Amino acid sequence: MKRAQAPHNPLLAELKAVHGMLRRDLAACRQLAIAAANGAPTAQIRSGIKQLQTRGPLLQLRSNCIRHCHTVHAHHEGEDTGLFPTIRRAAPHMRATIDRLQADHRVVSDLLDQVEGVARNLQNTGDSRARLVDALTTLSTHLLAHLDFEEKALAPILLTMKARPANG
């Protein structure tokens, strides 16, 4: 028996597209940090960075990590100020879910701040690169679980929404 495919919903599609970008960019930054920490040849690091449309290994690794963190912060701020208040009004039964997602946002925000701090102080030393790998690994564990939970939890309500919620 074939399962019916869920109808296309632009809000859910956008959420998944943004989450896909966040996953992809986080994985790229993390892989570059691991490669640098493991002493990968500069050419390999440059090649990975070029895929992120940048140049200059450690400087650009730092820049990409910081930019990724800012993107996630902005995405979560948009959810906290626009999407989540709309869902609270439209689906009061989802209050506990929204509370959990906002608590996750606070944890992820702290982890993003840690990654940013380590990235800003990134030096051409094994210890410095290892700290970035550790920070990105911890962020990955929490952020990827959060993204998966959020998509599953919000899909039913997003499928009922016709337009993007306004912020505020």
Predicted regions and their residues:
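Small-residue-biased structural context
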Residues: M1-G168
